[in-house]
């Protein structure tokens, strides 16, 4: 009869340096199967000043990967979450641009914006408009270092309007008013609310 022998060896450990804007920076002993996300978890995660978009994995003095947590959270992509090797360093820099979106979007909160991203990108991160949002324009409040500025951005400029650190985007609600509604009451066969159009402009119709 055939015999199969299985030997279970000890999993090799590696030392990984986690530096920068994390809760507990330091050198960690991890299993050789560890990834960048796992190392960040052991360091307590990114702190309030840290970037979630531009985390570097450095090996032998060279950057070999960039971790963008948004790619994983919002798109399910984990291309930067590579397997680590002994001596690797994970460096979390401060965030570059943090903006707030408030009002009638599905996920109103602060978002970190990467270089080249626009107002349209931010609306995508925020889950897009709610059903009762006013979509034709939004209001951006910006700090210029001395005072505040207001920018009214129309919808045809969403994909071109670049946001800067400290911007606040406010999405309003539709006005509760109808553009083509008429209500008929009194001595008619059917009272009610009807559509008003170019072809219907008298009660008899």
Which residue ranges define each predicted feature?
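Ser/Thr/Pro/Gly-biased, low-complexity, turn-/loop-rich segments
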Residues: 1-205
């Amino acid at each position: 009869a055939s015999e199969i022998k299985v030997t279970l060896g000890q999993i090799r450990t590696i030392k990984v340096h986690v530096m920068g804007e994390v809760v507990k920076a330091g050198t960690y002993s991890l299993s050789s199967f560890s990834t960048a996300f796992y190392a960040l978890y052991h360091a307590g995660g990114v702190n309030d000043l840290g970037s979630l978009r531009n985390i570097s994995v450095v090996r032998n003095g060279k950057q070999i990967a960039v971790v963008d947590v948004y790619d994983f959270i919002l798109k399910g992509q984990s291309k930067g979450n590579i397997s680590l090797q002994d001596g690797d360093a994970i460096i979390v820099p401060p965030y570059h641009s943090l903006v707030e979106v408030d009002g009638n979007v599905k996920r109103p909160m602060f978002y970190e914006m990467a270089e080249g991203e626009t107002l349209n990108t931010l609306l995508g991160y925020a889950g897009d408009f709610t059903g009762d949002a006013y979509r034709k324009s939004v209001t951006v409040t910006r700090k210029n270092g001395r005072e505040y500025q207001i920018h009214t951005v129309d919808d045809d400029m969403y994909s071109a309007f670049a946001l800067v650190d400290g911007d606040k985007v406010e999405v309003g609600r539709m006005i509760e008013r109808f553009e083509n509604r008429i209500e008929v009451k009194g001595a008619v066969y059917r009272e009610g609310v009807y559509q008003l159009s170019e072809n219907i402009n008298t009660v008899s119709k």
